């Protein structure tokens, strides 16, 4: 906790006297230690997707909020409301977007309403937060690559945080473990002052997720990624959601960012059809509300398959499905339940 407080002060410049709009109550715990006022919007934290966009923006403006942490679904509501009403967020210093990968277009759109602030995309987990971060300007610089399937931008590790990549494995790491070579995909593992040492009274979970390397205790994030040519950490998806296809392994972020860049797509999910490896890759598409006619859906599906064939030529992706709403986690209403979708469509 002390490491997290230091990171919020030293890295993000959070200061006493600021005002935070808290959309996830647990993050309000930081505010008393920072000397920051907490404002709670009219929101049910268990269903942020149902929050009123008007209420959220009015809270930001009425209480002169300087900082907030929200999931992409909240960020989208705020950005759309500001756009529709031609509103600005003049005193906002920082808008943290986290909980699931945020489309570059959303990040840039939010930033356009903040005259004196930044949109930050922090990376971390309950066991390690924050690990790294990037700003909206970095996302803009890498947007073209992201939408080509090069992975989400996670930025640079925070001072004092060590990020290593190790070969993908479902087994606990032993003493002989070695890092992957530069540019190779591996499991993201982290150590530092913002990383927990163990699970309380859960030795089995600690054994599976923690290991010693170069005299430091590292935590396995369960995420896949790589360092690009600029040593920027890139995110490719969850390890358990990587597909073993006839053409090789395919990570979710290499595919979904391409699909999400198609006009009319709200979000998407890469799943595998079948119960045994190798599985057939299939893209589940959730269209925007105004693109749900049979004609519009057909255009979207054809464009999705066309882009995938160009940008992922090594993979054969010919299957698409349409869902009116993708199943998501209850906490952020943003993490897509891909394994549940795979089970549903594999049984049909």
Model feature map: region roles:
Residues 2-19, 24-66, 81:
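Conserved AMP-binding/adenylation subdomain of ANL enzymes
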Residues 9, 20-21, 36, 67-69, ...:
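Gly/Ser/Thr-rich phosphate-binding loop
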Residues 195, 209-210, 232-260, 284-295, ...:
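Adenylate-forming
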Residues 150-157, 179, 215-216:
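Short Gly/Pro-enriched turn/cap motifs at secondary-structure boundaries
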Residues 110, 225, 258-260, 308-309:
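Hydrophobic C-terminal alpha-helix "anchor/cap" residues
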Residues 172, 178-246:
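Conserved ATP-binding/catalytic segment of the ANL
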Residues 269-274, 282-283, 305-348:
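Conserved C-terminal "lid"/linker of ANL adenylate-forming enzymes
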Residues 175-176, 222-224, 261-288, 316-319:
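C-terminal boundary motif of the adenylate-forming
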